[in-house]
Amino acid sequence: MDLIILVGIAIALLVVIISLYLLQKKNSTTEAKPAAAAPQRGVPQRAQEGVPRRAQIARNQRNRLRQNAPVAAAAPQAEAPAGSDNDDDAQADGEGARLPQGAVLDEKMGAKKRAKMEAKEAKRVQREQELYDREQRKAKEAKEDAERKQQEEIEAEAERKKAEAERLAKEERERKEHEEYLKMKAAFSVEEEGFEEGDADEQDNLLADFIQYIKDNKVVVLEDLAVAFKLKTQQAIDRIQELQADGTITGVIDDRGKFIYVSEEELVAVAKFIKQRGRVSIADLAESSNNLINLTPVSAEGSS
């Protein structure tokens, strides 16, 4: 019986303790509600919590940027012509903010805003680097063009000097040839006058010796003939042509500077040979000419 009483007392005490605990908790909750401000209808949660609105943040940001603008404007603008190219990158963002060169980003700025402005700054730096590289490339190309033009001018000047030297050399050569021609012509005229004024017998003897020298040697080197009779080579050629024209001698001057004398009898023999054969090739004529035309000098025939 005593055990049942003790269990009942314990249960009663436990119920009382639980009731007191619940009552105390309810009272503490009721006291805390008046301390908290009731939410206001129509007012944003950020304003109720004391957080500045986005418009206020933008105004504060613009104020700070305007304060930093004079400092950025004082820096030298090295790339002034490229200002028009950077207008798009320097425009204000969605709320009209402009990032001046060298401006320090606000620590309180939002992460998205900061990333956007950092991207614009990186793009501006990249644009300036590209502009610098382009200017360097243009300067290098201009230098190479100038060097190429200078080299072309040097080559053109060298070519002009070479052509001028060739022209002067040609004129000098033609002048000397003309002087030689005039001297030869004058000497020929003087010699002709001497023949006319000299003794007629002496002239005839000299001409006869000239003709006999050709007939005796058969093949005469024109330079040797001129030396033998104290004439110039051209004078000797002119005299031979005159003698051929009047029929005194017959023969041919080859391209090696020799006169080959052919007598009348030998010409008749060649003509007879051609007439007999009817048609004669050059090879046959050349082969037969060795027998028809005697090219051995008279002095050699006498000694043999």
Curated annotation (Swiss-Prot):
Residues 24-304 are cytoplasmic. GO terms for molecular function: ubiquitin-like protein ligase binding. Keywords: Endoplasmic reticulum, Membrane, Transmembrane, Transmembrane helix, Ubl conjugation pathway. It is found in: Endoplasmic reticulum membrane. It is a single-pass membrane protein. Its main location: endoplasmic reticulum. Residues 1-2 are lumenal. The keyword Lyase does not apply. The chain crosses the membrane at residues 3-23. Residues 105-174 have a biased composition (Basic and acidic residues). The keyword Transferase does not apply. GO terms for cellular component: endoplasmic reticulum membrane. Disulfide bonds: none annotated. SUPFAM superfamilies: Winged helix' DNA-binding domain (SSF46785). Residues 31-174 are annotated as: Disordered. InterPro entries: DDRGK_dom-contain, DDRGK_domain-containing, WH-like_DNA-bd_sf, WH_DNA-bd_sf. Substrate adapter for ufmylation, the covalent attachment of the ubiquitin-like modifier UFM1 to substrate proteins. Required for ufmylation of Atg9; protects the nervous system during aging, possibly by stabilizing Atg9 and supporting its function. Interacts with Atg9; the interaction is transient. This is DDRGK domain-containing protein 1. It comes from Drosophila ananassae (Fruit fly). The lineage of its organism: Eukaryota, Metazoa, Ecdysozoa, Arthropoda, Hexapoda.
